[in-house]
Amino acid sequence: GKITFYEDRNFQGRCYECSTDCPDLSPYFS
């Protein structure tokens, strides 16, 4: 489901690594 959408390198690289900048995505990755 959601993992497929965040599979993009550009998106994942910024929000996945910098969870502080994207707190909204924090619950999706945790």
Swiss-Prot record:
| Species this protein is from | Rhizoprionodon acutus
Job description of the protein: Crystallins are the dominant structural components of the vertebrate eye lens.
Q: What is known of its domains?
A: Has a two-domain beta-structure, folded into four very similar Greek key motifs.
Entry-linked Gene3D superfamilies:
Crystallins
Query: What SUPFAM superfamilies does its record include?
Result: gamma-Crystallin-like (SSF49695)
Q: Name one Pfam family in it.
A: Crystall
Residue ranges occupied by any Beta/gamma crystallin 'Greek key' domain in the UniProt entry: 1-30
Q: Which PROSITE patterns match?
A: CRYSTALLIN_BETA_GAMMA
The record describes its quaternary structure and partners as: Monomer.
The molecule here is called Gamma-II crystallin
Its keywords, alphabetically, are: Eye lens protein, Repeat
